[in-house]
């Protein structure tokens, strides 16, 4: 969520010259997690932890996951899913929902547009012709309902961040469609390439042919599995040593089997 929302803020700044943001991590491009600027667009990282996302009424919403989490708050996965459905129901009339392919949500408001995104599975927004470059970066073409944006590269490595970039571009595409301002493909490519990431989100401190040291905030089994898979794809055949920090007693208690499998 943090990388995707920070990407939305950075891409919006590049495309419009303005915009504000409330982010859940420290953006390296902006030098903080609060961005204040001109223009009507505001990027917010919504949080389901204490149901605070139900205080938001977005024009465009991105849902990257509705996995079981925060069961100390919700009690059951079904109760969490109901909260996500309520959040989706708060999207403004004429707005848009961008949801990850495979995430099952109840969508009860017919007055919004619904789009699916994925890493490379064909749907409304996805990456194709993905090529691994030196240092774990990727080149890819980004497919949108309005056409293909070719030759994209992201300033940070990892295949999971390609998926985040697809989601962020989808959000900007929806906002631009609503405002009648088509995306500028060249400026979008430049903004993706200049994105520096977020502290503690797949952050590399050492990246040499002999040694690599990186830090990631992945604190859910599925996030952890995605981070480990990304590292293995970037450095095939290399020895991987992982230091795991349990985050919240209740989450560790509820998902210790899934953490072990990840």
Segments the model singles out, each with a brief description of its role:
Residues 51, 119, 131-132, 145, ...:
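Short polar/acidic secondary-structure junctions
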Residues 49-52, 68-71, 122, 135, ...:
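Short, acidic Gly/Pro/Ser/Thr-rich loop/turn segments
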Residues 135, 140, 145-262:
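Nucleotide phosphate-binding/pyrophosphate-handling subdomain across enzymes
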Residues 4-9, 13, 122-128, 151, ...:
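Short, basic phosphate-binding NTP loop
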Residues 29-30, 124, 250:
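Generic structural signal for helix capping and beta-alpha/helix-loop junctions
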Residues 21-25, 100-101, 111-134, 153-159, ...:
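Beta-strand->loop->alpha-helix junctions that form or flank phosphate-binding loops
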Residues 1-101, 105-113, 166-175, 235:
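Phosphate-binding loop of NTP-binding sites
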